From Swiss-Prot:
<dbReference type="Pfam" id="PF02402">
    <property type="entry name" value="Lysis_col"/>
</dbReference>
<keyword id="KW-0472">Membrane</keyword>
<keyword id="KW-0564">Palmitate</keyword>
<keyword id="KW-0732">Signal</keyword>
<feature type="lipid moiety-binding region" description="S-diacylglycerol cysteine">
    <location>
        <position position="20"/>
    </location>
</feature>
<protein>
    <recommendedName>
        <fullName>Lysis protein for colicin E9</fullName>
    </recommendedName>
</protein>
<keyword id="KW-0449">Lipoprotein</keyword>
<comment type="function">
    <text>Lysis proteins are required for both colicin release and partial cell lysis.</text>
</comment>
<dbReference type="InterPro" id="IPR003059">
    <property type="entry name" value="Lysis_col"/>
</dbReference>
<dbReference type="GO" id="GO:0019835">
    <property type="term" value="P:cytolysis"/>
</dbReference>
<keyword id="KW-0614">Plasmid</keyword>
<keyword id="KW-0998">Cell outer membrane</keyword>
<feature type="lipid moiety-binding region" description="N-palmitoyl cysteine">
    <location>
        <position position="20"/>
    </location>
</feature>
<dbReference type="GO" id="GO:0009279">
    <property type="term" value="C:cell outer membrane"/>
</dbReference>
<feature type="signal peptide">
    <location>
        <begin position="1"/>
        <end position="19"/>
    </location>
</feature>
Amino acid sequence: MKKITGIILLLLAAIILAACQANYIRDVQGGTVSPSSSAELTGLATQ
């Protein structure tokens, strides 16, 4: 049972990372340097 939970957690982490990466790539391609609302929602630290 513990192994299944670990696999589910790994899948969730991968999905969240992929979503963050997609948002970042989209923002960069859009040419916006200012932090976007999506970055604030995901909790990314913008400097």
